[in-house]
Amino acid sequence: MISPNRQGIVVWLTSLKYARQLRRFGHVQYVSKKMKYVVFYCDQSKVPELVDKLSSFHFVTDVKPSMRPFINTEYEGAKPDKAKEYDYKLGI
């Protein structure tokens, strides 16, 4: 079962042969062969400890947690575009 409070972590590696080792820390979502990074998800409560732990590995060059859970996605007072509103009324 997927936890509702999960957060993404991006880990840049020196070599992709270590990408499989990251599976024990969370759910690996994407591995970039060209840019040598791994995107995986884990519980939001474990993120600070995982960032410290992953940074200590010799094969990790950089670790960045995702800020998406902290960004407000509900916009108040957004003005609709008049041209699109007119097109919707015409049925285009």
Swiss-Prot record:
Q: A cellular component term (GO) from this record?
A: cytoplasm
Output the Pfam families linked to this UniProt entry. DUF2129
- Report which superkingdom the organism of origin falls in: Bacteria
Keywords (alphabetical) are: Cytoplasm
Q: Does the keyword Cytoplasm apply?
A: yes
Its subcellular locations are: Cytoplasm
Task: Please verify whether the record's keywords include Protein biosynthesis.
Answer: no
- Broad class of the protein's primary localization: cytoplasm
- Protein family according to the UniProt entry: Belongs to the UPF0298 family.
Record-given protein name: UPF0298 protein ABC2380
